[in-house]
Amino acid sequence: MNAILTGQVFYSYQHELLERGSFADIGAHFSGIKPFHKHAGEIALSDDKLFISGDENLQIPLASIEQIYLGFDEAFPRTLVKNFGVFWQPLRLSLSNGNKLYLIIDYNMLGANNQLWFDGLKKLLSD
């Protein structure tokens, strides 16, 4: 695999976000707490696949990504992010199998590299 981008990732499926308790919304605003997520690992982007390894091992063909979205929605609201999303927003992938993945890539307490990954995915998907 010839990686275009690599990084560390926190992620959740849409159903996991919708099933979270109210403590997750409150806990997100404490210093030193990582953003809400159910899974963690490493992520790599090649010219035809997205690879996630960690507590799950996923290989997502880029052809199966129906939509990418950078921002908040009803499943991942601003209340889940410290400073209500001033410094970063989640990256959502809508897949052809009906799953929606919410990614937080290279989080460092101040921000994340989601914009870089959004731009990279957008470029590959438009080619």
Each predicted region: which residue ranges?
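Intrinsically disordered, low-complexity boundary segments flanking structured domains
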Residues: 1, 56-57, 89-91
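Anionic N-terminal interaction surfaces
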Residues: 1-44, 99, 117, 124-127
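Phosphoinositide-binding peripheral membrane targeting modules
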Residues: 35-86
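Acidic, Ser/Thr- and proline-rich intrinsically disordered linker/docking segments
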Residues: 64-127
